[in-house]
């Protein structure tokens, strides 16, 4: 497992550096702007693209065929993808949280004010990946582009339709903060279910 994770980071190191540069620019915009919340959410979702890119790299390099003759189980291969995604998202969230706390101290606000945003961003991004990763394991990165776009757009379409229908959702910061514990448990359950589904899909796949 450790070797698989190391391979993910070494293979994607140039892309990770590129993403880090882009995120640093956005964090600077957030620091000199008025709100960091939007930047934190964007940075976490932006990092989900890393695992999608890793699938594309694996397909083009022939890694998927090679790794299946190594002394690792298919379950470990699946878990390494999930862990890679979670580590990247957690890293982006932690860095954003650090900047948020520093800004709060500078502005005389409570240190952990709006700290919940980073956690909420990780949970939402994890739910997104819980849907995306089984699709990627099933059909691969190249064939799933349209599906990924649709999955990404569905929440926005639902929100737009709800607004047009006059449905008002109580999504105040206080309400969202109170939902964090339940949302966290639900997210863990969904991620574990997604991982099990991906293992089933990948276990039956032929190379």
Language model feature labels by segment:
Residues 69-74:
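Short helix-to-coil transition segments within interhelical loops
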Residues 1-62, 80-207:
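Hydrophobic alpha-helical transmembrane segments of membrane proteins
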Residues 76-78:
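Alpha-helix N-cap/helix-start motif at helix boundaries, enriched for small hydrophobics
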């Amino acid at each position: 497992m450790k070797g698989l994770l190391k391979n993910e980071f070494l293979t994607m190191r140039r892309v990770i550096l590129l993403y880090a540069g882009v995120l640093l620019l956005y964090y600077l915009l957030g620091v000199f702007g008025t709100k960091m919340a939007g930047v934190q959410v964007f940075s976490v979702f932006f990092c989900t693209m890393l695992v999608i890119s890793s699938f594309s790299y694996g397909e083009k390099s022939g890694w998927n065929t090679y790794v299946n003759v190594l002394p690792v189980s298919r379950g470990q291969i699946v878990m390494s993808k999930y862990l890679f995604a979670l580590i990247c998202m957690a890293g982006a969230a932690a860095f954003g949280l650090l900047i948020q706390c520093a800004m709060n101290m500078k502005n005389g606000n409570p240190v952990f004010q709006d700290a919940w945003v980073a956690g909420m961003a990780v949970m939402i991004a994890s739910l997104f990946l819980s849907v995306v990763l089984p699709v990627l394991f099933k059909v691969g990165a190249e064939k799933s582009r349209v599906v990924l776009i649709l999955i990404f757009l569905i929440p926005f379409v639902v929100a737009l339709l709800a607004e047009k229908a006059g449905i008002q959702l109580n999504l105040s910061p206080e309400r969202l903060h109170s939902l964090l514990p339940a949302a966290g448990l639900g997210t863990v359950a969904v991620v574990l279910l997604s991982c099990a589904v991906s293992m089933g899909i990948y276990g039956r796949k032929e190379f």
